[in-house]
Amino acid sequence: LVANEGDAWDVFLNIIDIVFETLDAKNIDIDNLPEPELYKSLKIHDIPHRIIDWVGLSVFLKIKVLAKRTAEMHINLGSESEDTAFTPTHFNGDYSVWLKNRMIYQFQNRLNSIENNLHKLDDYSLEMAKDLLSKKSLIRSKFLKFDWTKLKGERIRVHGDYHLGQILVHNEDFYILDFEGEPESTIRDRQVKQPPMKDVAGLFRSFHYAIYATIFNNENKYNKSQVALFNAAELLYGYFTGVFLETYISTVEQANLNIGYKQERNFMLEYCLLEKAIYELGYELNSRPTWAVIPLKGISNLINN
């Protein structure tokens, strides 16, 4: 057993709540805050002072530690040299066919869910859902654009269901647990070696959820409009992920874990993020339509930027 103060989900909900309260306490003009380039590595000393003043340096230091622990998890999972079930392997045609079939099936399933549940959505969510439907061919082509012959990185056994709720916090450090894989996947699919960016994407979607969940859980508490809070949410997400990537990438590269060249990493991250957001959308449409805005915004970021 690991002594702990709870999971990272609850810890980050508390942190993000304080960050949003600071918007009011310091009367911060969200529209004038500098925007980060999404999914670009960002050193802490390159974060604008106004962002540090708003969010707090300690928050970004926590994210650096979490990134390091995530990288160390992948380094260990990718270090096996004898057991072929765990040795790193390159991308190939079989994996490409498996992945594309899985993605297209899942995407078509989500399209059907959107069309059947449009009446449950309103305003911003409805607008983004209609935008998604109008761009379904573009999204489908993104999934089919997976060309394994251009990928030089390696696949490893990954966590498979990596999010803030799977991480315990103790003494400002993080402990990762529950390596069973994606609950909806078959055992055979869970054993398929994946790009490490699949776990990174899972954690990034969890950051996105934690930020928006904080807004939804405390709407009556903050003075800013929902639109302003959503804008702040995207800024916060951009800085969280940028700081995470800088530490994660430098750590795995120092250990010679092959996650591919820069353009390849970006492609794999966005591919896995799109996969994850579409997976989430089906759940939200069926269970919490008011929260469908979270995966819809994630999808919109990827297809419109």
Where are these regions (language model features)?
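Conserved ATP-binding subdomain of kinase catalytic cores across diverse folds
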Residues: 1-116, 158-159, 164-262
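An alpha-helical support segment within catalytic cores of ATP-dependent transferases
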Residues: 110-156
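ATP/Mg2+ or Mg2+-diphosphate-binding catalytic cores
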Residues: 127, 231-257, 267-305
